[in-house]
Amino acid sequence: MIFLKKAAIISGVFISGLIGAGFATGSEIYFYFSRFGMWGIAGVFLAVLIFAFMQYAVLNQAHINKTFTIDEYLKKILKKPLCNLVSAFSYMFMIFILSAMMSGFGEMMYEMYGIKKLFGAVLMLVCTIIIVKKGYNGFVSTQSILSVAIVLIIGGVCFYILSFGNNQIEVFNPQFSWAGSAVCYTGYNMLTAVAVLCILAKDTQKKTSVFSALITFVILVFLMAVMWYIIFKFDGIINLGSMPILRICMYNSNNLAIIYSLAVFFSMLTTAVSSAYALSVKY
């Protein structure tokens, strides 16, 4: 059963890189899925299906071709001019994500606790550097452990929230633009995720790739579906702002918001670490 343990670890590292500030706060769910009403849940399933398929495909191909960096991987599937362009864009996006997580955490610390934004940004940077300097084993173990904490906190808080509030869900905007929104959501997230999957491919094989993709599918469907439902329970009842789930927690109690802010912090950290580690492999 060792392959199942490896599959779970790989899935954890992959998920920890996907679940950033936008996911944990619910802003991505709100923007990419909630505005399509009941059709939004179809978008959730489509997005997660794409994530799981891409995870399997990249892991399997990278392992077969022994392409353990995004540069090596892209050289196998793209011609040189396009390969260089996509590679450069991916690394630029990683730098952007790293910067966004730092500034985002600084903003959250200021909004929730009145702490200076610079302090929050520096704290995020220091934590990221410490984890990256631990090397591959430190990166994998830290990301997989934090992914468990993220899933448990988000899942636990969301189930608690389900016990109060409005249960009405409106059906509106029933058109196939929900599919385009789902594809767009997965597309920009995979820019950095591919780099991490290539790094993880050295520890995988076909069976591991399949099971890790299945684990990812189950976990992401659960998290995204319950968050989508909760947003609909409270949309129109309170001002959801740019951090819907966190706002809903604050609506219930400050203690719940503090607990959930841990998940947001861990999510920002793991996303920042994923980008930083992929960049460290490059440079």
Predicted segments, located by residue:
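Hydrophobic, membrane-embedded alpha-helices of multi-pass small-molecule transporters
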Residues: 5-24, 93-94, 98, 161-165, ...
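Extracellular loop-to-transmembrane helix junctions
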Residues: 5-7, 32-57, 210-225
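Transmembrane alpha-helical segments of multi-pass small-molecule transport proteins
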Residues: 7-17, 42-53, 84-95, 111-135, ...
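Small-residue-rich segments of transmembrane alpha-helices in multi-pass membrane proteins
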Residues: 19, 40-44, 75-87, 146-162, ...
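Juxtamembrane transmembrane-helix boundary signature
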Residues: 45-71, 230, 234
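Hydrophobic transmembrane alpha-helices that form the core helical bundles
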Residues: 57-113, 261-283
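Membrane-water interface regions at transmembrane-helix termini and the short interhelical loops
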Residues: 61, 100-112, 125-146, 202-205
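Membrane-interface interhelical connector segments
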Residues: 232-254
